[in-house]
């Protein structure tokens, strides 16, 4: 079967790989669509991110949907031909973090397409996958398999909101309106945020943010002072979600957040310096957010029930044979948001 495998920076190959045997409680799935994530791009462009480096060939991808092709003898509640979104989160269930309900911090996590552990955890950009039964989340008849592959990035946004606490009736700023930022805006709208301001440095993501429910969009590249009005009286936003990984964006968030507001760092852009005096003086609650687990089921339900419409986020779909072109397109933020690879009829 064909798989999209990264060997090192700028060395992405479409290779034939072997499918593992089907276990008793597992499913064999024909992969339909896979979305290219920012972490996939980091592996492709730079060979990793931060201290995480590719040390062996790794199949990329963790945002996938598909159709069940075969079932292990012990699987119940799933049928052949069922259309599913596939959760990439595979915690052990036994370590102290899993036992505490913090599955995203599992000490033995097998998250698809991750070079954090060694040997690396192979990803989901393959024509077929063997998955655990619990990873399969059925999708509604009306939901396309392309949209179903958005469940993963939507889950990231839902976990970020969970980390922030209630946003009901709150004034919210989102900086960075790529796929995760835009889907986060859709989730914030559903969670009852009173007003959502979206900021970015490009028009395309801001257009998407507007379609996803932002009340105001601001291009900080063309109007650097546009957020100054929100700095008055010690800040105006109850919550800030920083989804770009930019130090400048984080500082803007600190300037515009109210005292004792919650600032959630969603994007990972590397280590930065922080204005600790400002954080202390404003008593800002600075929180990280990392992946998700239980939120995946909620994300699928939101998509199934039309509570969040992810269609505006998808800007390109290319067949697996053009995977390298798809990665290059995904890296061009002037013309793309979420680019997906199609494995159907590959």
List the model feature ranges, each with a label.
Residues 94-175:
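NAD(P)H dinucleotide-binding glycine-rich loop of Rossmann-like/cofactor-binding domains
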Residues 261:
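Glycine-centered, small-residue-biased loops immediately flanking beta-strands
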Residues 174-177, 189-252:
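Adenosine-nucleotide cofactor-binding segment
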Residues 20-34, 49-99, 140-143:
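Glycine-rich beta-strand-centered segment in the early N-terminal region that forms part
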Residues 5-21, 38-70, 85-87, 106-122:
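N-terminal glycine-rich cofactor-binding segment
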Residues 3, 251-255, 293, 297-346:
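C-terminal hydrophobic helical "lid"/dimerization subdomain
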Residues 181-182:
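N-terminal Rossmann-fold NAD(P) dinucleotide-binding loop
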Residues 267-283:
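Rossmann-fold NAD(P)-binding glycine/threonine-rich loop
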């Amino acid at each position: 079967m064909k798989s999209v495998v990264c060997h090192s920076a700028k060395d992405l190959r479409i290779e034939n790989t072997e499918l593992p045997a089907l276990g008793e409680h597992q499913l064999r799935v024909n992969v339909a669509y896979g979305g290219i994530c920012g972490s996939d791009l980091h592996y492709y462009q730079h060979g990793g991110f931060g201290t995480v480096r590719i040390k062996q060939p790794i199949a990329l991808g963790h945002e996938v949907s598909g159709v069940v092709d075969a079932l292990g003898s012990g699987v119940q509640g799933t049928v052949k031909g069922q259309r599913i979104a596939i959760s990439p989160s595979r915690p052990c269930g036994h370590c102290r973090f899993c036992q505490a309900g913090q599955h995203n911090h599992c000490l033995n996590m097998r998250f698809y397409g991750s070079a954090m552990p060694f040997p690396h955890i192979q990803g989901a950009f393959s024509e077929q996958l063997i998955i655990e039964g619990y990873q399969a989340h059925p999708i509604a008849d009306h939901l396309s398999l392309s949209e179903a592959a958005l469940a993963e990035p939507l889950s990231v946004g839902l976990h970020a909101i969970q980390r922030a606490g209630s946003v009901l009736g709150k004034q919210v700023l989102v900086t960075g309106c790529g796929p995760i930022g835009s889907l986060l805006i859709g989730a914030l709208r559903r969670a009852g945020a009173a007003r959502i301001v979206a900021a970015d440095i490009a028009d395309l993501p801001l257009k998407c943010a507007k379609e996803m429910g932002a009340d105001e969009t601001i291009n900080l590249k063309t109007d650097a002072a546009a957020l100054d009005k929100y700095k008055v009286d010690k800040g105006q936003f109850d919550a800030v979600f920083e989804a770009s990984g930019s130090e400048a964006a984080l500082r803007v968030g600190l300037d515009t957040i109210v005292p004792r507001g919650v600032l959630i760092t969603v994007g990972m852009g590397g280590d930065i310096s922080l204005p600790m005096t400002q954080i202390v003086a404003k008593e800002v609650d600075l929180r990280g957010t990392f992946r998700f687990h239980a939120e995946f089921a909620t994300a699928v339900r939101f998509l199934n029930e039309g509570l969040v419409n992810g269609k505006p986020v998808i800007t390109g779909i290319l067949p697996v044979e053009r995977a390298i072109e798809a990665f290059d397109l995904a890296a061009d933020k002037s013309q793309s948001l979420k680019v997906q690879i199609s494995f159907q009829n590959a």
